[in-house]
Amino acid sequence: MTPRQSSSITKIIRASTILIALFSLAGCLQTQVSTPLALPSPTVGLASPSPTLPPTPTTEATLPPEPSPQPSPIATQNPLPPATMITDIAGHVQTYELGCEASAAVDWAGYYDVLIYESTFQFELPLSDNPELGFVGNVTTDGWGQIPPHAYGVHAPPIAELLREYSLPAVAVKDMTIEDVKAELAEGDPIIAWVIGNMVYSSPIKIYDKEGNAVVVAPYEHVVILVGYDETTITYMNNGFFYSVPTEVFLTSWSVLGNMAVIYD
């Protein structure tokens, strides 16, 4: 081998060595590029807590508490005045000794502007042996102060019934109280009251009529018109004149025939 050939072979070997080195380097670079770097996985944070929801309102309505039952108001009557007097009533002296009931009845009717003659009213009353049913006695001839079957007079029911025929709202009552009397008078309504004589006492007597009906009577039965009161007295009209007596005196006399009266109702 010539020196020139040897030199050529040496160059070829060097060139091959360089190429091999270059290929090796290129392979390393390719390996580094193709293998991705292991990146750290992203840290998964803790889930944020869900926002707290407000409580769902209940659908059931809250009812207000029931009010406590209150007592019903009690109707109160107006207090009675301490005194009153009916002054615009006129009276007259009775025509017949035994005719006090008819005399008082027509005076009472006149107060309500109803004109009735005493004699007319008297003879329109039915006759009976029972004063609860009609007039007992002969008004033109008999005297006062007896009891049935003798001449006597008449009680409240026949008087009220006849007054109603004159379109007056007359009502016969018994067992009235002094408060009832004051209430009527305070309303401006006079009262026909059955008493004994001039506000005296007499013993009540039970009798029986021909039909066997019992009735309480008293000697000297009399009728007046009550027109006023104050704290201690009752005022009444008798034969057109006015008188005042202690309330207790009136009540004693009035009680004999059971607190009997005719009122405007």
Give the location of each predicted region.
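Mid-length scaffold segments of soluble, non-membrane domains
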Residues: 146-179, 184-186
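A short, structured loop/turn motif at beta-sheet edges
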Residues: 183-189, 228-233
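N-terminal secretory signal peptides that target proteins for export/translocation
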Residues: 1-9
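A mature extracytoplasmic/lumenal domain signature
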Residues: 104, 174-177, 195-199, 228-230, ...
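Structural recognition of the beta-strand scaffold that forms the well-ordered cores
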Residues: 99, 171-173, 191-195, 225, ...
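Bacterial N-terminal signal peptides
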Residues: 16-26
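Noncatalytic regulatory segments and standalone regulatory/sensor domains
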Residues: 148, 201, 205-218, 223-265
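Active-site-adjacent structural segments surrounding the nucleophilic cysteine of cysteine proteases
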Residues: 28-158, 197-199, 204-208, 214-217, ...
